[in-house]
Amino acid sequence: MSVTMRQMLEAGVHFGHQTRFWNPKMAPYIFGQRNKIHIVNLEHTLVMFRDALDYARRLAANKETILFVGTKRQARDIVKEEAIRCGAPYVNQRWLGGMLTNFKTIRQSIKRLQDMEKMVQDGTLNKLVKKEALDFQRELEKLNASLGGIKEMKGLPDAMFVIDVGYQKGTIIEANKLGIPVVGVVDTNHNPAGIQYVIPGNDDSSQAIRLYARAMADAILEGRNQAIQEIVEIGKTDSEVLSGQDLSADA
């Protein structure tokens, strides 16, 4: 998917926050103001958004992992839906402190979640008494809500895609500590520092959030398909070379 200016306008990407809440570090990306609302310069956003998508494509082509993060109400369902569509891990409920910096401990909780899911599948849950089964179900739901999106993640992600960097401050701090690159949607009231790939734009509109997440998921799928295509082309070339050698031998 190639993002266009028209798509961004229709999604309201250009609508920033009230001027009194602005962060001066976002000044280079602001076009002006209308009715005390800052207007994002979409010419800058278009270039930076496309750069971020190119980066995601390259990572995906190299089989690297991008973690989707969006825990605010407007982003939760969209982040989950698009991450699942492209096979990426995601966090769409509460960000647990240490989710990156203390990943070893988080892995233990993920193991517990996976063991509990096996118990459901093999019928062990049915053997529990009513109260135990109820407690089990509650724990399973809680673990699934916080860790379900990363249960297949074998290690730390290679990069992160974050909706609303202000809302996810803890996430950004952890990523920066570990040197994990961040692609982040940054509205006019937030600080772009610590974000390697800034996407200046509206982080509140569900339409805008869907545009960002869908484009990122598409870029990941395109990158993976590109890698598969390259393998196929190499296979074809090898076959042609071998075929040519066989013909030479026959001659």
Swiss-Prot record:
CDD domains: RPS2. GO terms for cellular component: cytosolic small ribosomal subunit. Keywords: Ribonucleoprotein, Ribosomal protein. GO terms for molecular function: structural constituent of ribosome. The keyword Transport does not apply. It comes from the Bacteria. GO terms for biological process: translation. The keyword Ribosomal protein applies. Belongs to the universal ribosomal protein uS2 family. HAMAP family: Ribosomal_uS2_B. This is Small ribosomal subunit protein uS2.
